[in-house]
Curated annotation (Swiss-Prot):
PROSITE patterns: ABC_TRANSPORTER_1 (PS00211), ABC_TRANSPORTER_2 (PS50893), PSTB (PS51238). Residues 48-289 form the ABC transporter domain. Residues 1-24 are annotated as: Disordered. Its EC number is 7.3.2.1. This is Phosphate import ATP-binding protein PstB. It is found in: Cell inner membrane. SUPFAM superfamilies: P-loop containing nucleoside triphosphate hydrolases. It comes from Hahella chejuensis (strain KCTC 2396). The lineage of its organism: Bacteria, Pseudomonadati, Pseudomonadota, Gammaproteobacteria, Oceanospirillales. NCBIfam families: 3a0107s01c2. PANTHER family: ABC TRANSPORTER I FAMILY MEMBER 17, IRON EXPORT ATP-BINDING PROTEIN FETA-RELATED.
Amino acid sequence: MSETMTNQNVVNEEQPFNESKHRSHGIDISAIERSMEDLSIDNETIALEVNKLKLFYGEKEALHGIDLSIPQKRVTAFIGPSGCGKSTLLRCFNRMNDLVDGCRIDGQILLEQEDIYRKGVDVAELRRRVGMVFQKPNPFPKTIYENVAYGLRIQGINKKRILDETVEWALKSAALWDEVKDRLNDSALGLSGGQQQRLVIARTVAVKPEVLLLDEPASALDPLSTLKIEELIHELKNDYTIVIVTHNMQQAARVSDYTAFMYMGDLIEFGSTNQLFTNPSCKQTEDYITGRYG
């Protein structure tokens, strides 16, 4: 799959890769090489399979025949310039694009070999299984406790013991419990931006999803809060498949196992983060990660 994918929807002009240029743009290639396993998509269990996916806004085609495999319990990063289709593709995975007037898709997205766009799919259940965290923290105007318990109550879970245990577990999973355990009845709106984002992650994992979609989850946060989110992503991938959209290539290099580079609605290149950042197959990829455009 990896070799086939890398050569689909690509510009085939290749040039020798100049590693020193990456260091000049702040990406420590040696650190990536030291930290990454020798990954291959061929050896992975696949969580999400994208087959010939096209997306249209009215008559405008925004995604052009995407083929992609998202490995289970790994972090996959989508990178590329603004408007390239990263977030559009991400929102396809839990059908958030259904909410956009005039939006339609051709092709398939398979979750556990089931097409999530087939007729009769329970979209609410799909969005439980494939949770999403947005760029700007969006806590509800409720207490910290009720923010996390909200999805459970929607599912009809109201037993206090179950709610208490799940809220504590979810807040611990989001590395927030120690900071809020003595003020669970305080408003979530009083938390810092970084705490609010981790609360949103806790709210998402409380309903036991299989996949977490993160759309620029740290772009509105300060460096310390960003570091906490990145550390949390490393922890969460032990239990969840994670797909993250980021404009920050250093962040993609730090947190992801696999990276997909997109440009103008096309998937240009996909591979292990190690391979893509140290030895990209396509000149377009090299140009982007070395800062020539984007």
